[in-house]
Each structure stands twice: as structure tokens, then as C-alpha cells.
Amino acid sequence: MSSPLAPVGIFDSGVGGLTVARAIIDQLPDEDIVYVGDTGNGPYGPLTIPEVRAHALAIGDDLVGRGVKALVIACNTASAACLRDARERYDVPVVEVILPAVRRAVATTRNGRIGVIGTRATITSHAYQDAFAAARDTEITAVACPRFVDFVERGVTSGRQVLGLAEGYLEPLQRSGVDTLVLGCTHYPLLSGLIQLVMGDNVTLVSSAEETAKEVLRVLTERDILRPHDAPPATRLFEATGDPEAFMALAARFLGPALTGVQPVRPSGMH
């Protein structure tokens, strides 16, 4: 069994998973975390599922090898690509971002019409559609929004260009009358103001980040490995497989004082 003092490992293809890290810091402020942003290989959306799986498992191997007590796949595309493999491969709990968001969306919808937006890889994997299959009386409309990630990774979350892009992407969801919209990519909460503007106030946005943090709390509590309140102050280590300075410039926008620095990392399984 893992030590309660061990850190929680979190990874994503880039900065998007920091929305999950931020939610975990807010909900579990005593926990040590190690975050890896795979900016050297991301974004994952345009890659094939085998490519995503290889990159994700290399990072998972590295984090588990460093003794994390839980592994959070803070990326919808990676969750769709390698969740089953990761749970078979590692002896620590693996938390993903898809099912927590699906549960919240089902509990939230009033008319049963739920939208999902994500990367092309996530949408074509049918991971969300399959996760919703058990929910009765729901109609799912899934739309790929591949260029959203590019804008977020460049730090562009408002303006005429991204607004026009959002209007085009979201039009099928407006047509289908969804009342609940799952932000099926951890980058997308950074565009939530824009998305809400386009969809209107009658549509509820569901962030996988908030729901995933709640799931981490549940898992650590069930396994009795929550870090005690009287432990030394929490440490948060942020690493990037690409340029750490570029990562830090973007990450600082939504982590603020929680971000004290970014280290370069190259997991041994990566090519």
C-alpha cells in the first residue's frame, strides 16, 4: 500500500491538465503533487491512438517509478487511449477524466440532450459516447473542436478569431438543443467564458477538471491514503518534456502563486 505522504502524479499533453491540477490543489491543499506536461510530444489530439498510448504510458511509467500514490490522467485523449492499459499496468489507483464528467452531466441535464466537445482523437474514439451508453433517456451530440487546443497552448483565450471558431464548432450543438455541455478536453475550461457566451446561459457547462478532483478525493479517502493535515507543507513539482520556460509562461496565467518553477524532464521510455 502506498504511503499517505507520497505525491499524487498528474500528467497531460501540455498545459490543459493544469486545470485538473488547480482543482486538486483547491480541493486537496495538503497533497504533494508532481505534474508532467508532455509539451515535447503534444498536443495529442492529432496523433494516432497507438502514438498517444506510447507517450502516455512512458510518462505513467516514470511517475509510478518515482513512487506516486495515485496517477491522474488529466487528458481526455490519453484517457481514451490508455486507461485500460494503465490500470492493468500499475499497482496504484488510476483516475481519469471521462467518467467523472459523464456522471455529472447525467445528473445535471434537464432535457436529456447532452453535448460533448473534445479533440478529434477523443471524439472518434467514442470514449464519451460509450460512457454515456448506460444512461437512460439521453441523446448525445459529440463535436470535435481540434483547433481549440492550439489557441489555449498559445495563450489565446479570447478575441474575434477564437470567437468565430467557437461559433462554427458549437453551431451543431445549438441546433440539437443540448442543455448540458461537457468540456471533454482539459484545455477547454480556459475557454469556458467564450463557450458560455456562444451557447447561452441556459446551457450548463461541465468541467472534467472539477469532477476529476472530486474523484481523486474519493479514491484517496477510500484507500485511507490522504495526506495528514499535520504533515509538512505540501510541495508541488511541475515538469515539462518540452521548453520549460514556455510552459511556465502559460501555466502561470492560471496557477498563479501555486507555480514556483518548471523543471525539464525526459521519461526513459520516450523516443
From Swiss-Prot:
GO MF annotations, alphabetized: glutamate racemase activity
Keywords carried by this UniProt record: Cell shape, Cell wall biogenesis/degradation, Isomerase, Peptidoglycan synthesis
Main enzyme class: isomerase
Cell wall biogenesis/degradation found in the keyword field: yes
Catalytic activity, reaction form: L-glutamate = D-glutamate
One Pfam family matching this protein: Asp_Glu_race
Pathway the protein contributes to: Cell wall biogenesis; peptidoglycan biosynthesis
Residues given in the record as substrate binding sites: 12-13, 44-45, 76-77, 186-187
Active site positions, chain numbering: 75 (proton donor/acceptor), 185 (proton donor/acceptor)
PROSITE patterns found in the cross-reference section: ASP_GLU_RACEMASE_1 (PS00923), ASP_GLU_RACEMASE_2 (PS00924)
N-terminal signal peptide: none
GO annotation, biological process: cell wall organization; peptidoglycan biosynthetic process; regulation of cell shape
The EC number(s) this enzyme carries: 5.1.1.3
Transmembrane portions of the chain: none
Gene3D superfamilies the record matches: 3.40.50.1860
NCBIfam families xref list: glut_race
Family listed: Belongs to the aspartate/glutamate racemases family.
Entry function: Provides the (R)-glutamate required for cell wall biosynthesis.
Name recorded for this polypeptide: Glutamate racemase
UniProt gene name: murI
